[in-house]
Amino acid sequence: MKKVQRQMKWLFLAASISAALPVSAAKMVQVDDPSLLEQALSMQARSIVPTQNGFQVVKSVTLPNGKVKVRYQQMYHGLPVFNTSVVATQTEKGIGQVYGMLAQQIDSDVVSTSPQVEQKQAVSIALTHYQQQNPSLTSADLVTENERAQLMVRLDENQMAQMVYLVDFFVATNEPARPFFFIDANSGDVLQTWEGLNHAEATGTGPGGNQKTGFYQYGTDFPGLVINKVGNTCSMMNSAVKTVDMKHATSGGSTFSYSCTDASNYNDYKAINGAYSPLNDAHYFGKVVFDMYKDWMNTTPLTFQLTMRVHYDSNYENAFWNGSSMTFGDGQNTFYPLVDINVSAHEVSHGFTEQNSGLVYQNMSGGINEAFSDIAGEAAEFYMKGSVDWVVGSDIFKSSGGLRYFDQPSKDGRSIDHASQYYNGLNVHYSSGVFNRAYYLLANKANWSVRKGFEVFTVANQLYWTANSTFDQGGCGVAKAAQDLGYNKADVVDAFNQVGVNASCGVVPPTENVLEKGKPVIGLQGTRSSEAFYTFTVASSTSAKVSISLGSGDADLYVKAGSKPTTSSWDCRPYKSGNNEQCTISATPGTTYHVMLKGYSNYSGVTLRLD
């Protein structure tokens, strides 16, 4: 053997990377350069890893095709760094492809991580600020729930690293809200605020239906409800979902239970505003959403039991996710009660986004956030019914048509069809049209479907999107997810291109020689340590063999998918003496495969071939 390589555990230091790429101040950088990873790993191999710095594992995701992806969160002295994430492919050989964003040279801006403002003070500052911005609210009116403050590091719009608290809480009033704040952890200044309550403007039917959809029965027309029964009392609760009757209040509520004295366990409480039983609707649809995520993605939409709160307030024409539960109004003139499969999946999926990518609910990231929930709503409709109408809210919208449209979002008179129509401050429900249409175009391509489209968007949410992802970054994440799943990445890039989003991840078409199947390249020569690069792609999934033969001297063959191989980063490297080497790989369309010939010694007369 020419050399023995040591497999190293994947966990590298932010400090190591900073040393590898010297800069003068904090800044965000993209991690996809194999040479950067090579430097970081090399330095890591010689270091003792401090647990408070570097990257911590957030989750490990096993894709339906068996590939294992690991997502890491950057840490600085034990604090998470906002809007950073690195994803790596775990293979039998160790770590494969890497992609993500990290912050460099934080220590040039943040010297100490001991905050001058305590956690409770940060919450109090946020509450005071919220009340000042909403003077009509008295202290007695300001009823809050789920108060949270997390200490972290972020880079502001000027690339200045700051230690901050991310504070949020739910305001339980007739006009519910969930404000978010960045509070300076030293000065107590309010640096940024945004409204994070994930409202649903479009909804659908519930168990029993409504006057528009018609009446149907669970247990006859659809499977029965999964409930809990003790004696003659039934409760709407199971391992995935509990359903709460709010009784037209804006806070409180308890799990709905009813008398059930026979085997039918029949519940018809209660008909309202043209719907036959919104409580049944919510309970059934919540379970369907959990089942879809489990069956299709081998995951759960939430890390905790879902709470579905029904009959919220009086004549409330909306639905929202407050960070821990889903809440439905009964509608009035515009809507029937807002419980249906689309809305249930939509709002629960805001929770999924919050627990995965953490997309901020404003700007482009907010549009992606809202679109993912719309996409999940259509996916759940397909999972339940076997078909979709590509319209958001048609079943519970009392007028004709719907609230949002996938095929042409601008049909609603407000949403945009193309990224070129986006402007700062555009409502996230309207900017969602860009990703909604991209999903529609992708799902309707040959060899694609509602399910496959949902899979790539979901993996992007799990692994590649970050808090402030732009449209291009979000599209790149979906393309990378398609590649991970073995789907046609080029189809994803094309779908996003049609809506003005560059999903190519900034990849420049290769300028190296392109190999063609069955057409050998002959007479190759090089000196010791020289490197020559070639690329190839395939039109359909196939077994591809790359080989070198003949000639004198010693050339080594390297092959890697997605980026140039190096001596420490490759998918195949026979590493034999002489020039008779070959690599056989399972190639998929939409991926560029890179080939390197490296001179172990001077070589000449070598033939390179793709079969």
UniProtKB/Swiss-Prot annotation:
Residues 1-25 form the signal peptide. Residues 26-199 form a propeptide. Binds 1 Ca(2+) ion per subunit. Binds 1 zinc ion per subunit. Seems to be more extensively processed. GO terms for cellular component: extracellular region. Its main location: secreted. Keywords: Calcium, Hydrolase, Metal-binding, Metalloprotease, Protease, Secreted, Signal, Virulence, Zinc, Zymogen. GO terms for molecular function: metal ion binding; metalloendopeptidase activity. Its cofactor is Ca(2+); Zn(2+). Its EC number is 3.4.24.-. The active site is at 347, 429 (proton donor). GO terms for biological process: proteolysis. SUPFAM superfamilies: Collagen-binding domain (SSF89260), Metalloproteases ('zincins'), catalytic domain (SSF55486). Zn(2+) binds at residues 346, 350, 370. Gene3D superfamilies: 2.60.120.380, 3.10.170.10, 3.10.450.40, 3.10.450.490, Neutral Protease Domain 2. It is found in: Secreted. Extracellular zinc metalloprotease involved in the virulence mechanism of V.anguillarum. Belongs to the peptidase M4 family. This is Virulence metalloprotease. It comes from Vibrio anguillarum (Listonella anguillarum). The gene is empA.
